[in-house]
Amino acid sequence: MKKRALVSVSDKTGVVEFVKGLLEQGIEVISTGGTKKLLEENGLQVIGISEVTGFPEIMDGRVKTLHPNIHGGLLAVRDNETHVAQMNELGMEPIDFVIVNLYPFKETIAKPDVTFADAIENIDIGGPTMIRSAAKNHKFVSVIVDPVDYDVVLAELKENGEVKEETKRKLAAKVFRHTAAYDALISNYLTEQMGEENPETLTVTFEKKQDLRYGENPHQKATFYKAPFAVTSSVAYAEQLHGKELSYNNINDADAALSIVKEFTEPAVVAVKHMNPCGVGVGTDIHEAYTRAYEADPVSIFGGIIAANREIDKATAEKLHEIFLEIIIAPSFSKEALEVLQSKKNLRLLTVNIEKATSASKKLTSVQGGLLVQEEDTLSLDESTISIPTKREPSEQEWKDLKLAWKVVKHVKSNAIVLAKDDMTIGVGAGQMNRVGSAKIAITQAGEKAQGSALASDAFFPMPDTVEEAAKAGITAIIQPGGSIRDEDSIKVADTYGIAMVFTGVRHFKH
């Protein structure tokens, strides 16, 4: 019996060549609507779906393949005598190949002016039903949903006269991944349209960006996936201009650096190691900002990741070239800067839009047996809601330093303390189990520079000991959330030493 293929695609990439190859193998081709028209325009002889179903396409094409003659031909188990007898009795013929991809729902809802009606109209019904039927019966039916698989299928047909069982199984698995992702996009879109923030079930879909050499450590396997609608201002959507492939740790660190540099509107440079900032500088231009970021911690920046929110120019590139760095990420690089930096063959250069995230972004964190979902911490300092409980208010320069430190401290692993002075960080205390421990680390790193600096804490002071350490180091201004039952103790110490202290009312834990 002659084999038959059903072809109905929205992505018409390579379909003419593929169908030509099927016809050359003696396979009869059934097609629908726009696909049939395209194939016939290219001189290929195909059978219309209505000739198989005995029923016209109706309701603007909504109903065309949902018919027993189609699904019987797909689902019949060919070595089951009852199935074969029923097919013969009903005049059905088997379908051996299904080449279908679905209505472009993802592309439709990505359009800024899409209407709800347009989105609904691009929900495919017949397509998923066909490919699921074919995939279920993959022992007898080859189902192709991705043009990338056309060549593999044709090659096996030419060599063996049929598609290998292993290939059929892989194609079937791909179908169910495809339909699962498709349905996830639809369910998430409808959930968002209803304004439902915490649905009873959460279905997420990600697309593979690349396999990684290994994970956090060489013995761990890893892969990088991107969200279908991730913000373009992200590592997932960055363009790599030069250097080795990104590693798992590179991606984590670049993400951290990018998150911090987005906090600034003025020219800024951030240096990151192990997902914590080791140096942050701002300036009148990117060269000055980098100089300050470097001077913030010239030891830790070695082997680090750099993020800048302005184009990297030649002068800055020459300074960057002087030390070993893993990654430089920026909106762009001048031609001269690229010539300088590309002389280091392993240095990864990435370009990406620098846009501050919104609260609509969701952060997913896996835990054993589950998943935590929360809004990204995008809250900025609101000067209209702050309070100053101390006798002295910050000076203009202290305010400047406090704001810089506060922007940075929210991105440091808790317990977090950041010292800033003269448009740069000078000390970072991260990830300690007690707050005063982080303060001591930051103060030690700052050394004499701590005199006259500003301190930011990601959470309140449970004891006045951090303020006492700050006073000993000559720190003159502090910004913290406040809210401890012992706030008065910290205020009293601050007043004793003439320290200005600001309460924000907002905590910025980061774990």
Swiss-Prot record:
Its EC number is 2.1.2.3, 3.5.4.10. One of its GO terms (biological process) is 'de novo' IMP biosynthetic process. It catalyses: (6R)-10-formyltetrahydrofolate + 5-amino-1-(5-phospho-beta-D-ribosyl)imidazole-4-carboxamide = 5-formamido-1-(5-phospho-D-ribosyl)imidazole-4-carboxamide + (6S)-5,6,7,8-tetrahydrofolate; IMP + H2O = 5-formamido-1-(5-phospho-D-ribosyl)imidazole-4-carboxamide. It comes from the Bacteria. SMART domains: AICARFT_IMPCHas, MGS. One of its GO terms (cellular component) is cytosol. GO terms for molecular function: IMP cyclohydrolase activity; phosphoribosylaminoimidazolecarboxamide formyltransferase activity. Keywords: Hydrolase, Multifunctional enzyme, Purine biosynthesis, Transferase. The IMP cyclohydrolase activity resides in the N-terminal region. This is Bifunctional purine biosynthesis protein PurH. It comes from Bacillus thuringiensis (strain Al Hakam). The lineage of its organism: Bacteria, Bacillati, Bacillota, Bacilli, Bacillales.
